[in-house]
C-alpha cells in the first residue's frame, strides 16, 4: 500500500542562519589608569539624618591635639604645686600657731574645693550630653536588631532619665504590651510609639509657645534691639526647657555646646528644607499682601524659633525619628499665621469703634 506524496514546501529564507555574536573590543588598563581606578557608585540620595549624626558626633568628640595635652599637663602640674604649697603653709601656720594664716589657708582650701567641684560638675553634665548621642546610636542599632534581652533594660533606663514615674499610664501600657517572645526591635518600637510621644508632645507645646511669643513680640515691638535681645533670651530658654524635659541637665559649657550644635545642625541642613516646607505655601497664600511688614517679620522670627526648637529636640531626644513623627515647620506655621491674623484683627476692631 503506497502513501501519496506530500506537496513541496518552499521556505523564503535559509534554515540555518549563521549567527555571528558581536564581542566588545578588549580594554586594557595601563599602570596609571590602574592606580587611579575607582568603582562607579550608584546615585543614591544621601541620608541627611545620618550625615547630621556624623557631624554631631565629630563635634561632640574632643579633639586630641598636642597643644591640648600640653595645656592640660601644665594645669595639672600647677594644681599639684598649689596643693603642695597650701599643705606646707598650713603645717607652718599650725606649728607657729599663726591663726590668721591658718584661716587664710582654710579659706583658700574652700575656694579651691568649690572650683574643683564646679569643674567636675560641668564635666559630668557635658559628658551626659555626649552620652545622649551614643544612646541614640544604640537605639538605632536596637531598632535593627533581632536579639533579645537588651531592649527592655535600655527603655527603662530612658524612662528613668526622663523622670517618668513607674505608675505613668503610658509606661504602664508599654509594660502591658511587651512579653518575653518579642525581640529588641519590637520592644524599642513599642516604647517609641507609646512612651516617647508623651515627652515629644510636651516639647512640641514648648516650641509652639516660644514661637508664638517670638512672633507676637516682633509683630508689635517697634525697637529692633529689644527684639533681638528678646529672641536670644527666648531661644536659650527654649533649649534649656527641652533639654530638661528629655532628662539632660545643662551646665554653662554644656549649654554653650548644645547651642553650638543646634546652630551647626541648622547650618548643615541648609536652607533647602526651609524653602521646601515653607516657601511654596508662603507664596501661594500671598502673605505679603495680607499682612504688614512687622507681622511678616514676626512670622519669620517665629519660624526661626520653631526650627531652633525642632533641632534642639532632635539632639536631646534619646531615640531616632520613626516614620513621620518628626515635627515640621508647616505644623507651626499655620498656627503662627492664625495667631498673627487674630492679633491684627483685634487691634483693628477697637480702632474702628
UniProtKB/Swiss-Prot annotation:
Record has Signal as a keyword: no
Organism: Escherichia coli (strain SMS-3-5 / SECEC)
Membrane topology: Multi-pass membrane protein
Keywords: Cell inner membrane, Cell membrane, Membrane, Transmembrane, Transmembrane helix
Annotated signal sequence range: none
Residues annotated as transmembrane: 70-90, 100-120, 213-233
InterPro entries in the cross-refs: DUF697 (IPR021147), UPF0283 (IPR006507)
Location (main, coarse): membrane
UniProt-annotated location(s): Cell inner membrane
GO cellular component, one term: plasma membrane
A Pfam family recorded for this sequence: DUF697
Designated name of the protein: UPF0283 membrane protein YcjF
Family stated for the protein in its record: Belongs to the UPF0283 family.
